[in-house]
Amino acid sequence: MSSASTFGQNAWLVDEMFQQFQKDPKSVDKEWRELFEAQGGPNTTPATTEAQPSAPKESAKPAPKAAPAAKAAPRVETKPADKTAPKAKESSVPQQPKLPEPGQTPIRGIFKSIAKNMDISLEIPTATSVRDMPARLMFENRAMVNDQLKRTRGGKISFTHIIGYAMVKAVMAHPDMNNSYDVIDGKPTLIVPEHINLGLAIDLPQKDGSRALVVAAIKETEKMNFSEFLAAYEDIVARSRKGKLTMDDYQGVTVSLTNPGGIGTRHSVPRLTKGQGTIIGVGSMDYPAEFQGASEDRLAELGVGKLVTITSTYDHRVIQGAVSGEFLRTMSRLLTDDSFWDEIFDAMNVPYTPMRWAQDVPNTGVDKNTRVMQLIEAYRSRGHLIADTNPLSWVQPGMPVPDHRDLDIETHNLTIWDLDRTFNVGGFGGKETMTLREVLSRLRAAYTLKVGSEYTHILDRDERTWLQDRLEAGMPKPTQAEQKYILQKLNAAEAFENFLQTKYVGQKRFSLEGAEALIPLMDSAIDTAAGQGLDEVVIGMPHRGRLNVLFNIVGKPLASIFNEFEGQMEQGQIGGSGDVKYHLGSEGQHLQMFGDGEIKVSLTANPSHLEAVNPVMEGIVRAKQDYLDKGVDGKTVVPLLLHGDAAFAGLGIVPETINLAKLRGYDVGGTIHIVVNNQIGFTTTPDSSRSMHYATDYAKAFGCPVFHVNGDDPEAVVWVGQLATEYRRRFGKDVFIDLVCYRLRGHNEADDPSMTQPKMYELITGRETVRAQYTEDLLGRGDLSNEDAEAVVRDFHDQMESVFNEVKEGGKKQAEAQTGITGSQKLPHGLETNISREELLELGQAFANTPEGFNYHPRVAPVAKKRVSSVTEGGIDWAWGELLAFGSLANSGRLVRLAGEDSRRGTFTQRHAVAIDPATAEEFNPLHELAQSKGNNGKFLVYNSALTEYAGMGFEYGYSVGNEDSIVAWEAQFGDFANGAQTIIDEYVSSGEAKWGQTSKLILLLPHGYEGQGPDHSSARIERFLQLCAEGSMTVAQPSTPANHFHLLRRHALSDLKRPLVIFTPKSMLRNKAAASAPEDFTEVTKFQSVINDPNVADAAKVKKVMLVSGKLYYELAKRKEKDGRDDIAIVRIEMLHPIPFNRISEALAGYPNAEEVLFVQDEPANQGPWPFYQEHLPELIPNMPKMRRVSRRAQSSTATGVAKVHQLEEKQLIDEAFEA
């Protein structure tokens, strides 16, 4: 058997291996032994090793013209050199090598086999086609790919990789080039191979210093994309260097590639060996000869690029010259073809569009300088679309790929021939002129690396310029100390999660794994705030990563966290329901790492209702800022709000809260938002969870900058944290950081995400953590020793192990039944809430003391006049009685805040807390001006809110928590609309104290009353609030007079009781003269009355029927009673619905010893209102009371009828039933 036909050019290697086999059979691999034993001779089937072909050699820059040669000097006798003589120049002529000794040497061994193969090759009738191909596009696109590889996975591609892949594609288009010739059974035969097996000609050094050529095969290349081809190519190369090629690697070559251009050869005709039909030779890359003396500037001006000469040597017996010529033309077209380069860029995950082959465009029409400026602006506005921000480097299935053709130079009528030309750039990068290549390099560095920035949508030019300058200046390299600090934070984040995973297997903790860069990011923002001399950072966040943040950012003791895992409650948590560990809050101090700053850090408690914490945290921050009262620039408490990507895009509370940012009653000087974008929501992918391209696209609607940052680049993450904090301080606006990362585990630690995201978790499983990657980077750069890296992790683990053991040794305390919070706070009984007559007059006079030149609106002036007179003459209505409470509290030095939709005027045109001059639009808040005149820091602040209940109520709740000494009231436009804030009511208002020990004195003012306005303007859902009442969690009231409302508000504000107050306020009663109060009700009546007995009972002994009622229905029943002259009926008003004033009710009932019937009369349907709650609890509290019967509308699914006549009929029937004999 001929080794030449099977192994081609590698036949010499077979001979060498066989000689080794003859000397020592064990010295060759098993495959070779089996082959030689089967063949029994040296010409058995060969095997090959291969080394990497060298890349085509680039020519140097054109050399300057050589100086004329000097005339030869006459030979003279040498003398000692003078000390001052100049040193002689060394000759630039290379020293001539010594010629070998003449003689004759027999050729043996390898070279004998090679010579034999060459003789055999002469039997093949070959022909050669030659083609010069433009190489400019290869230079540009190869550089783009290699830049991307340098920033991501490392490595590079060579020209030979590209040409080899183009060769495979061309063979696929011209399969005849893959054929070969052989003689089988004495007959000429055309061989058509099954696959395209590309042979790489590799020059291997031998032990004796000589070199030998082998050809190794990349098999089945037609099935590969470029990335696969590159991997197979590099595998062959790597194994050839290590001598690890197998016999199979040397066999089956169908076409070969050789690259003499690597040593500067421009054109060669390689030999074709038996068994192959084609061999391609690649020459060096150089400018055409006639331009090799031109300067770079001249070459750029002329648009001259380098060429590469490629030859196709083929077996003329099976391949015709036309086919070979077409083959080379196809290769040339591929190397300048858009789709070929698109395929390579896609396979290599290069986010940019490849450079395109194009003819040079003359500088006519629109000036090219203008086009370059347009390109710069395109990158500023859309460069983020191709930024390398996704650590998984993949496109989510179903998500459309954005169009970023604006970033292609071709879009701007620029071509590759413009890259080295100089253009005016208007100060970009601090220069007036640059080459297009320099411009692209700077633009990509600023806008397309690990940070993608969106800021050009911002309307304010100063903001845009500030951001532009910092982004285009680039990210400064951290110092070695800063790098070690970043690594320390990553170590802490990862070690904490690993420790919990090991010690508490299966317990839910919603780990941060995959997003550990959040810890250095938050630390960076807080550290920057500390350096700015600010007072506090308040954090709001969901449950994912919360434990890690509590420990590594807030500084919560490890022992406390471990105790929670052990089920042991801290002392402060005893009583109440408690909550899961990943809902709890805490606070600590942050010491600036590279400075002297120090700042308080607090984490707000939150429920699992995602994003519900947003408005609450903002309210807390605003309260703290108002308490510090540092003026316009005093927003020294920083809100830092964390989100999940799916929640941020999906939940309406997000834009509701962001919308508050620049409103005067809600501005907190900017919030730093971090979206922890792990690219999944539980099991839902982005294509099913948002219609926006980015989860953060809401932010742009509010004119805020967004920074998308790769979570696997901690240095970029830290820089963005600093930049965002600086922007917030400079411009007082919200700023958004989209931290693109992944979730290592499922939604919780017991979940298996591969069930729903198999492809995503193929990429995640086994992936190196960001800490490991960063450690390798620092080790590779020499910035850290391996010992230091290991010591940090070990010390951190030892610290946690020590605390863990202490907790374990402390022993588990036996769980105890929770006692509740009922006994911790009591209603104040002895507190007097009246004011003096002098203060009452002063409050009334405030509406007369208008600023000079101020005029009331014609419809408001009578209201102001009535308020001045009513404090002496009587007839104080509801709105004025309420304002008297707020104004008197502000007078005493308290901060009173009232906010809601239309609260300044009042939904029903009743309040007029702030008057507006119709001519000048000047505002006048009489009670605030009065409080300010006292000089005791009292304030009465009234704000119209945005049209939101959820965010509005949440903000006011947060405000009441952030400043417990303030009096905070949130008013609904109609009480019905409070259900838009049901999450705040359920999760915070009613249960915050029980779950987290978080107290609040928030007041909810909810207009409620059945006046025929329909099902959405009648009921504040009294039954729902009462259902939430337990353990004294809330005070719920429905006062019937302005004075009692006044006393209730003042009692709530002046007492030490810290619980929310829910008041169902009236609508029709606002102008009901029967419901007005006298001045003495504010000055002489000293307390709130939880129950008001019937004042119109002449003889209690005559009373046979007692009606229990609340709200405006009292006045309708009283009117009917008077009309009918019913002295056998007593109407008792329950003013406080919870806690149930059972003693006062019992006393009232006891005052009617002959009563035979107790009616509970209410406007609301039977299944709503106070009745269901009172039916259940009142008999338990008053065991001996007469049987109680309900009188109300029938049970309904809706709250009220929307038909006025039906409403009137229902009300008449209800009252008639109450007064039945």
Curated annotation (Swiss-Prot):
It catalyses: N(6)-[(R)-lipoyl]-L-lysyl-[protein] + 2-oxoglutarate + H(+) = N(6)-[(R)-S(8)-succinyldihydrolipoyl]-L-lysyl-[protein] + CO2; N(6)-[(R)-dihydrolipoyl]-L-lysyl-[protein] + succinyl-CoA = N(6)-[(R)-S(8)-succinyldihydrolipoyl]-L-lysyl-[protein] + CoA. InterPro entries: 2-oxoacid_DH_actylTfrase (IPR001078), 2-oxogl_dehyd_N (IPR032106), 2oxoglutarate_DH_E1 (IPR011603), CAT-like_dom_sf (IPR023213), DH_E1 (IPR001017), KGD_C_sf (IPR042179), ODO-1/KGD_C (IPR031717), THDP-binding (IPR029061). Residues 90-337 are annotated as: Succinyltransferase E2. Residues 53-73 have a biased composition (Low complexity). Residues 23-36, 74-90 have a biased composition (Basic and acidic residues). Changing T258A: Loss of E2 succinyltransferase activity, but nearly no effect on E1 dehydrogenase activity. Keywords: Acyltransferase, Magnesium, Metal-binding, Multifunctional enzyme, Oxidoreductase, Thiamine pyrophosphate, Transferase, Tricarboxylic acid cycle. Inhibited by unphosphorylated OdhI, but not by phosphorylated OdhI. Residues 41-52 have a biased composition (Polar residues). Pathway: Carbohydrate metabolism; tricarboxylic acid cycle; succinyl-CoA from 2-oxoglutarate (dehydrogenase route): step 1/1. OdhA is a fusion protein with two major domains exhibiting structural features of an E1 and E2 protein, and a short sequence stretch of E1 localized at the N-terminus, which is connected by a linker region to the rest of the protein. Deletion of individual parts of odhA show that all parts of odhA are required for a functional tricarboxylic acid cycle in C.glutamicum; the ODH activity is in fact completely abolished in each of these mutants, and the PDH activity is significantly reduced, which could indicate that the overall structure of the supercomplex is disturbed. Homodimer. Part of an unusual ODH/PDH supercomplex, consisting of AceE (E1), AceF (E2), and Lpd (E3) together with OdhA (E1+E2). Interacts with the FHA domain of unphosphorylated OdhI via its C-terminal dehydrogenase domain. Is non-lipoylated. In contrast, the E2 component AceF is the prominent lipoylated protein in C.glutamicum. In the N-terminal section; belongs to the alpha-ketoglutarate dehydrogenase family. This is 2-oxoglutarate dehydrogenase E1/E2 component. It comes from Corynebacterium glutamicum (strain ATCC 13032 / DSM 20300 / JCM 1318 / BCRC 11384 / CCUG 27702 / LMG 3730 / NBRC 12168 / NCIMB 10025 / NRRL B-2784 / 534).
